[in-house]
Amino acid sequence: MTIFDAVAKAIVPSVTHAIEENNKNREIQEKRQKETKDRNDRMVQNQKDRKEMIGLTNEKQTYSNSVKNAKTDNEKKIFQNLLDKTNSRITDIEKRQSGDISEYKRLVEENKNLEKNVKEFKEVMKPFEENDIIHNPKHVDEDTIEENKKKMEDIKEVLGFTKTAANGGLPPNHDEDNKKIAELKKKYDDVKNHGHSNSGGLVGSVFNAIVPSVKENLRNAELENIQKEIKQTEDKISNDDKFYNTYKLTDDERKQFGSNPGDPQATPTPTPTPTPTPTPTPTPTTTTTTTTTPKPTTTTTTTSTTTPTKTSTNTNDKPGIFETVGGGSGKVADALNPIRIVTGGAIFSDTMEKIGGGSGKLADEGVEAVGSGISNFAQSVGIIPKKQEPKKDENNNQSNNNNNNNQAGDDQNKNQNRDENNQGGENNQGGENNQDGENNQNGDENNQGGENNQGDENNQGGENNQGDQNNQDGGENNQDGGENNQDGHGNNQDGENNQDGGENNQDSGENNQDGGENNQDGGENNQDGGENNQDGGENNQDGGENNQDGGENNQDGENNQDGENNQENNRDGENNQDGGENNQDGGENNQDGENNQDGGENNQDDGENKQDGGENNQDGGENNQDDGENNQDGENNQDGGENNQDGDENNQDSGENNQDSGENNQDGGENNQDGDENNQDGGENNQDGENNQNGENNQDGGENNQDGENNQDGENNQDGGENNQDGGENNQDGGEDNQDGGENNQEGGEDNQDGGEDNQDGGEDNQDGGENNQGDENNQDVDENNQDGENNQDGDENNQDGENNQDGENNQDGDENNNQDGEQNQDGDENNQDGGENNQDGDENNNQDGDENNNQDGGENNQDGGENNQDGDENNNQDGGENNQDGENNQDGDENNNQDGEQNQDGDENNQEGDENNNQGDDENNNQDGDENNNQDGDENNQDGDENNQDGDENNQGNDENNQDGDQNNQGGDENNQDGDGENNQGDENNQDGGENNQDGGENNQDQDGSENNQGNNENNQGGDENNQDQDGGENNQGNDENNQGGDENNQGNENDQGGDENNQGGDENTNQEENGGNDE
């Protein structure tokens, strides 16, 4: 009989199927580990690609402008040739990255099957727990007793095979025992010839001299003990050999369970030797103790006095049989209990207790092996004589359920490894105190969101660091949300939900932006939330149907974040999501990383190596993380959608290919976005800040509010990974399939969302938990109707991106003192900010958002928005609104005034990132970022949507059915240059997003658009004229300057650029808002 035959016979035939499934799962897990490594290797390659793309992007911008400004056909031809070559290299890199996305989809699919297998396995085990015979051993008839006797014999056989397998199927190694016997024999001779070994010394000499007979008595007693010990060791060798021969494995079994035939012998499981009887003598003996680890001896009795020891003898680094066959904790010792062997540990441990108690630790061969309690059962039915009870107790107490550390303990273990692979990290997983917690979650074993950091081991979601001390993405107190709000405070949400875009599109991707082609931040039906869950995925994602990234009271909360209760379906909900395999998007105190987050180590709204998490953590504020104290991405919903999240049914906040990240970047994106190596909201070294993203000390967030007074989706997805941001390698905030949700899982991936391959922002069972529960059943990112929808998140009618801040009243994307993206700059490098290497959003000669020849706010390919547009759709802009956008009242969604500040930023009624009549894109009536009637980032009625759909409309959010947060292809200006707006500043004192000292706003204001001190209208200007600057807020200026901003003859609106290019927004020949309404080609 093979081990499988024995197992099947002893338990139930259907278990064989479960065992096979578990074996398959094991293979899948190993395969996935390899794939994780491969993916990390690809990340390194992608980082190299990203650096190359930065250069290529700048080249493309330069050549494109040169083609446009060429004075002769020959000159034009030369530059066109250079431009074609550059585009070809960019395409090669993009193709390579798109392969990663399809690979990710495959992994997601595989993980679904894995989950299915686990569920099936649990089903197979149900009959054991429901069997009355097991529950009521006293009410059994004679036939049942006979049947149970046989069953015990079979179980005994299972144990025998199990032990042999535990030793790799190899014969016992007697080297230690033989060595011990030799030493004992030598000792015997010494004692015999020289007397009792401890009879020396002055006291001994006197003693021996006075009482000669004592010496002889001691010697004889010791000789007798030595002989006994020699015999016991010899018996042990004999028993071990006999046992091995009885339960020998076949070659195939040996291959499967550890050692191949011919392999060196595995280290044998140490065997216990009984403690020798103490010698009655006052003289201490030193020879009666042994150093071998106890192991059950193979006696034929049913009880034993040896203490079982858990030891792993698997020297091949292969899973032990226990894990292979059924799981357990993976420790060989666990496996030594048939229950666990067959059923996978905790799942069946109840049954063991029901059969007879005990946690299933193996006391010894025989009846007790099944669990101490089985002895009680056996006695009750007459199988075992009651006289053996004392020994039984002595042996088995230690296996008692309560005493066992919950290793197989009923309740505690039930979802401790609810699925060994996911759940926010093997050890912490939504633990009450650490989940996303003190030590790892949000940053487990492999990183999640960043190869090396994301939720680093010690802080991510750690109790004390959340959003580094220097803050980052939010400042000391808020980070991506800030202490009180972040990512969806009660009043705003999706604050900078997607600002920060990718190479091609900004916060969305080439084809969609924060929403995808069809919607944005919500999708046609669900907006930033989806019909049922948003930012949660089909079932829950980032919260799931019932909870998601937050919940009314805790979100990513203090104690359970990412986990206290962990429900299978709420992901990023009550217990997980926003956590990922290793977790992410969480952590009590750190969130959004120690030094960079929303930017990564050196750059890009995410950082070279990490993602939405910064070196050590990720997306999560002290109290609420990725959600805000009360709601998270909206009280009731959250970035996501039934299928997509933060976007259309198919894409949202990412789009099939990108969104909130885009295929290649966005919100960090591979090449830039809010922090490309050389430009875009950051630059390699400063990204959104001098040194790290959104400012030296804080990041896209500011001390108190991060992206808004209270938060603003903090930088909900700025925050991104190399390719994806807030998500995984390939999907930001989700990736192709999950970005901030993605088609299937939103903010995390189908199964893990904002979290990792297996568990989304927290793991299957725990999600961005929150103090009380994260992702309350009724609100978390999931209400059917509001999700990022009617009532809030990314587009509430009254607040979204909220009433009080969203990139808001005081700063947005910046601390009060540090403002927007960094102490020195934000949204840009010291020299370039929000864009070009040297200028970005504000250099006198070269700024973005308006330079005569060259601006950025996106750059040709990225511009805070994407290749084709950003900062506004053709027909309905974003980032603007007559009164605020990103503003005092809301942004990204207020009925009458949205996004971009009281005066509005990046979109005042009269100017908005451009002149009333010409900005961005040069079209008089039609530009982005500024047309009175028609731009994104600023239309009176539509801004980031339309009254009905803005990033939050009941039906589509994010703008228009087809474009979202701006143009079909972009967005980004808005949220990106919302970037301030606030009544008091946005835009650090030193400002950012602008000149060396001011960035997008002038010394005192910065991309603040509308600040009391004006911003953008500064003497030093920024992003625009000498006197004005991307201020988008001065009543009449912004881009209205002599040199103009976002609308000059030669710029913005570069061929491939934003704000007016052939393909873009802001009014080009093909996109004319009036004609296309943001449905750019």
Curated annotation (Swiss-Prot):
Residues 18-131, 173-242 form a coiled coil. Residues 284-313, 396-410, 422-568, 576-602, 614-623, 633-644, 662-672, 680-733, 855-869, 877-888, 955-975, 983-1026, 1034-1081 have a biased composition (Low complexity). Residues 22-53, 411-421 have a biased composition (Basic and acidic residues). Residues 748-768, 778-832, 840-854, 889-954 have a biased composition (Acidic residues). One of its GO terms (biological process) is cheating during chimeric sorocarp development. Residues 22-60, 250-321, 388-1081 are annotated as: Disordered. Keywords: Coiled coil, Repeat. InterPro entries: SPATS2-like. Residues 267-283 have a biased composition (Pro residues). Contains about 100 repeats of the sequence DGENNQ or DGGENNQ. PANTHER family: SPERMATOGENESIS-ASSOCIATED SERINE-RICH PROTEIN 2, SPERMATOGENESIS-ASSOCIATED SERINE-RICH PROTEIN 2-RELATED. This is Uncharacterized protein DDB_G0290685. The lineage of its organism: Eukaryota, Amoebozoa, Evosea, Eumycetozoa, Dictyostelia.
